[in-house]
Swiss-Prot record:
UniProt record similarity statement: Belongs to the peptidase S14 family.
Gene encoding the protein: clpP1
Classification via SUPFAM superfamilies: ClpP/crotonase
Entries under InterPro entries matching the protein: ClpP, ClpP/crotonase-like_dom_sf, ClpP/TepA, ClpP_His_AS
Protein name: ATP-dependent Clp protease proteolytic subunit 1
An annotated Gene Ontology molecular function: ATP-dependent peptidase activity
Gene3D superfamilies: 2-enoyl-CoA Hydratase, Chain A, domain 1
Active-site residues from the entry: 113 (nucleophile), 138
One Pfam assignment: CLP_protease
One GO CC term on file: cytoplasm
Keywords, alphabetical: Cytoplasm, Hydrolase, Protease, Serine protease
Biological-process GO terms, alphabetical: protein quality control for misfolded or incompletely synthesized proteins
Length: 219
């Protein structure tokens, strides 16, 4: 299911910082403040609600490692993100695989690009989307500048990254690498039910009661 327009235009209206600030710093996230996010963390909920960059990746990896101190309990990662930095996203991805805990992923609103990749990287059987979530896959991109030699090096590295992302997405979805490569060559949009059929998620849920542990909500 394709949608018109590039994802960068879709991202314009999204809140760009929804994680708690450090103690003593001004609160962020539309006035919600640290208390809300500390309460969520106490319920083992992590929220990715912005483009993926180094700052948010450091916060999320730290939270994953903190919650991993109780290795037998699920961690709930809610995702509403237009994507972002591949290297920052890979730090989150590798930490998700590194810890013993099951990481339950839930798409809400938009899970695009690296947001989709992290969604699909959740524990098998525990990857969900809300009914009106949209998911986008596409190939990694980068603006190339500099000398001809530098551009050649960066282009080769980008091709390597594209192959690696396709390999990992294939592992998490059951689709072939060739299929992933074809489908991500241009923006490909999925609604929640199409994402389930493709293997990006395991189920579509409308209420917290339909998820393991109530999605951390106590439902």
């Amino acid at each position: 299911m394709r949608r018109p327009g590039a994802v960068v235009r879709r991202a314009g209206g999204y809140v760009t910082n929804l994680m708690p600030s450090a103690a003593g710093e001004p609160s962020i996230g539309g006035g919600l403040g640290d208390q809300v996010y500390n309460r969520l963390l106490g319920e083992r909920i992590i929220f990715l609600g912005q483009p993926v960059d180094d700052d948010i990746a450091n916060k999320i990896t730290a939270q994953l490692l903190l919650l991993a101190s109780d290795p037998d309990k699920d961690i709930f990662l809610y995702i509403n993100s237009p994507g972002g930095s591949i290297t920052a996203g890979m730090a989150i991805y590798d930490t998700m695989q590194y810890i013993k805990n099951d990481v339950v992923t839930i798409a809400m609103g938009l899970a695009a690009s690296m947001g989709q990749f992290l969604l699909s990287a959740g524990t098998p059987g525990k990857r969900f989307a809300l009914p009106n979530a949209e998911i986008l896959i596409h190939q990694p991109s980068a603006g190339l500048a500099g000398s001809a030699s530098d551009i050649k090096i960066h282009a080769e590295r980008l091709l390597h990254t594209k192959r690696r992302m396709a390999e990992l997405t294939s592992q998490h979805t059951g689709q072939t690498i060739e299929q992933i490569t074809r489908d991500s060559d241009r923006d490909r949009w999925f609604d929640a039910f199409e994402a389930k059929e493709y293997g990006l998620i395991d189920d579509v849920i409308a209420t917290a009661a339909g998820m393991p542990g109530g999605g951390g909500t106590g439902a």
